[in-house]
Amino acid sequence: MDSFKPYLAKVATGAALTREEARTAFDHLLSGEVTHAQAGAFLMALRVRGEAQDEIVGAAGALRERMVRVVAPAGAIDIVGTGGDHSGSYNVSTLASILTAACGVPVAKHGNRAASSRSGAADVLAALGVRLGLDPEGLARCLEEAGLCFMFAQAHHASMRHVAPVRVELGTRTLFNLLGPLCNPAGVAGQLLGVYAGSLAEPLTRVLADLGSRRVWTVHGSDGLDEITTTGPTAVVALEDGAIRHFTIDPREVGLALASPEDLRGADPEHNAAALRAVLDGARTPYRDIAVLNAGAALVVAGACAGLGEGVARAAQAIETGAARAVLARLVAVSNA
């Protein structure tokens, strides 16, 4: 496609695109107007140089314009990771989302099937009995009646089909791996976002600020997890009231024991679903600890708790009272109605 060639030529020199140029270039990519050779060369040029903030904002804008949107209550948040940490861990953000919803904060969770693990959010939720691929009206009902919905990425970003073959052929991370967490179909203004590389934390936080987010914690565990980990400290880049600050979370400071990486390693969706149900039924496991830690952080991001310790305590209470188990039961029932 001739109109795409100027953008390809510019990135080939190592120069960065402006926000507007990136938006237009990704409009072409997502419209299916670009050959596989052009798309692959373009994406790899960005990858090798490193994507600039304005390029990520422009790309996200192009994808957001095309996504199927969902109406969510005010104050809804997302708990999501970029994936790609190759940890094979349990479905931490999924369980944390259930706990957060049980504490009264609506969670519009956006996710997909496994990319680098054996069980992604979609995989474990399906194993738990949640129906995937609901239309926007069905998702809105889930939010209203269960306080939680799962927006299956492939049902909301049909334009991604144009670049799917290229991504498979490249077989490596590209900018598209980052766009999912930046393009929540419910337009949430608050996020707990995990990243597979610490170097991404501040740039993606600034991108979300540019895209209109109001409160964000972007986290990267010292063990490489795209979650707040319990094996050691976690670095946090927080967007709060228009300002960005950096701090570290140590699970021991909120009364949680350190875990080993093996403690957090999951398996297939059925195994992870059974482990999740066990936590909701009261099992005190390392999976429980990391889930209440992440849910506690989400409650702070949502403004429902003043501090992490309070958030962790509320998340734990949601398990003990059965409120979290009830959220999952309602989500299964409403999604299958």
Curated annotation (Swiss-Prot):
Keyword Transferase (UniProt): yes
Recorded GO CC terms: cytosol
Cofactor names: Mg(2+)
Enzyme class: transferase
SUPFAM superfamilies: Nucleoside phosphorylase/phosphoribosyltransferase catalytic domain (SSF52418), Nucleoside phosphorylase/phosphoribosyltransferase N-terminal domain (SSF47648)
Superkingdom of source: Bacteria
UniProt-listed Gene3D superfamilies: Nucleoside phosphorylase/phosphoribosyltransferase catalytic domain (3.40.1030.10), Transferase, Pyrimidine Nucleoside Phosphorylase, Chain C (1.20.970.10)
Subunit text: Homodimer.
Functional description taken from the UniProt entry: Catalyzes the transfer of the phosphoribosyl group of 5-phosphorylribose-1-pyrophosphate (PRPP) to anthranilate to yield N-(5'-phosphoribosyl)-anthranilate (PRA).
Protein name: Anthranilate phosphoribosyltransferase
GN (gene name): trpD
